[in-house]
Swiss-Prot record:
GO CC terms of this entry: cytosol
Cited function: Catalyzes the reduction of the glycolytic intermediate dihydroxyacetone phosphate (DHAP) to sn-glycerol 3-phosphate (G3P), the key precursor for phospholipid synthesis.
PROSITE patterns given in the database record: NAD_G3PDH
Protein source organism: Streptococcus mutans serotype c (strain ATCC 700610 / UA159)
Catalytic activity annotation: sn-glycerol 3-phosphate + NAD(+) = dihydroxyacetone phosphate + NADH + H(+); sn-glycerol 3-phosphate + NADP(+) = dihydroxyacetone phosphate + NADPH + H(+)
Name by which UniProt lists this protein: Glycerol-3-phosphate dehydrogenase [NAD(P)+]
Residues that, per the record, bind sn-glycerol 3-phosphate: 108, 139, 141, 194, 247, 257-259
Enzyme active site: 194
Coiled coil: none
Biochemical pathway: Membrane lipid metabolism; glycerophospholipid metabolism
Subcellular compartments: Cytoplasm
Length: 339
């Protein structure tokens, strides 16, 4: 593939890891963010120690303070910013971008209030003449492993197969591989909702439960993710793929997962405000829990795990009581995933 100019919006852990992948593939990478000290550190020391203490980045990766400079003559732009600011950043991009580019995002969440997926936000805020169909980059991936070039397989989802194939070629190499998928709804809902289940799995660990309980939450969590996703128009097969069960396994079982760690701390009795302050990173599963709970009520979708996490976070119910109370729910058949 010919060398491409890529703006990566968001110098967090995943944005930094994906920047390295793109740089390894010979592309010009421009990272943009809003913390001057962090951007200066990337340019002067080639490190991002807030997320990776022992990683030295290639000096060809440049960080930009000015969004206009980062977007100049780009071939593609990758959004890796928190869900809550995606719309704001997209508005800024639409005011600056003066030519058509491939628009991608690698964030996982649903917008509070509107309940919208991130690709929908980008479609609303960036005019058609400035972008391709949105490409979603999602799947089972810890930034801590990708940054050290561990083997990682994820998904490029788009309604436009050619745009998805472009992104597939853009990122793929001998340690990082993408598969295309036309089911944008399925890929995005899987990526967002698995964070809730990861909080639940972490909470079980924090409360001292074993592998049996964690496996139950993960598999029944997949069932309720699928129920809501299908109601929203997703293909149920997507949830058995990389962006579905794959991402759920990686996020629901690992200490690298900030959502799992948040759940673990909740399970040990820590207060949410203390957890968020100590972690110093966005815990998408917290805000997504509220959105998913509201959607489940609106669409009449049975989501008991999401409901239990919601009750604990937003209604003050004891986390152990909220989760263990599910054991007395009405009996159901396992294959009632669609109800």
């Amino acid at each position: 593939m010919i060398r491409q100019k890529i703006a990566v919006l968001g110098p967090g852990s995943w944005g930094t890891a994906l920047s390295q992948v793109l740089n390894d593939n010979g592309h010009e990478v421009r990272i943009w963010g809003n913390i001057p000290e962090q951007l200066d550190e990337i340019n002067e020391h080639h490190t991002n120690k807030r997320y990776f203490k022992d990683v030295v980045l290639d000096e060809k990766i440049k960080a930009y303070h000015d969004l206009e400079d980062a977007l100049k003559d780009i071939d593609a732009v990758l959004f890796v910013v928190p869900t809550k600011v995606t719309r704001l950043v997209a508005k800024q991009v639409s005011q600056i971008l003066d030519h058509k580019a491939v628009v991608m995002h690698a964030s996982k969440g649903l917008e509070p209030g509107t309940h919208e997926r991130l690709s929908v936000i980008l479609e609303e805020e960036i005019p058609n003449h400035l972008r391709s169909d949105i490409v979603v980059v999602s799947g089972p991936s810890h930034a801590e492993e990708t940054i050290v070039r561990d083997i990682t397989l994820i998904t490029a989802a788009s309604k436009d197969l050619e745009a998805a194939k472009y992104v597939q070629k853009l990122f793929s190499n001998n340690y990082f591989r993408l598969y295309t998928n036309p089911d944008v709804i399925g890929v995005e809902t899987a990526g967002a909702l698995k964070n809730i289940i990861a909080v639940g799995a972490g909470a079980l660990h924090g409360m001292g439960y074993g592998d049996n309980a964690k496996a139950a939450v993960i598999t029944r969590g997949l069932a309720e993710i699928t129920r809501l996703g299908v109601k929203l128009g997703a293909d149920p097969l997507t949830y058995s793929g990389l962006s579905g069960v794959g991402d759920l396994i990686v996020t629901g079982t690992s200490i690298y997962s900030r959502n799992w760690r948040a759940g673990d701390a909740l399970g040990r009795g820590e207060k949410l405000e203390d957890i968020e302050r100590n972690m110093g990173m966005v815990i998408e599963g917290i805000s997504t829990t509220k959105v998913a709970y509201e959607l489940s009520r609106e669409l009449n979708v049975y989501m008991p795990i999401t409901c239990a996490i919601y009750q604990s976070i937003y209604e003050g119910k004891n986390i152990k009581e909220a989760i263990t109370s599910m054991m007395s729910n009405e009996f159901r058949a396992e294959n009632e995933w669609s109800k």
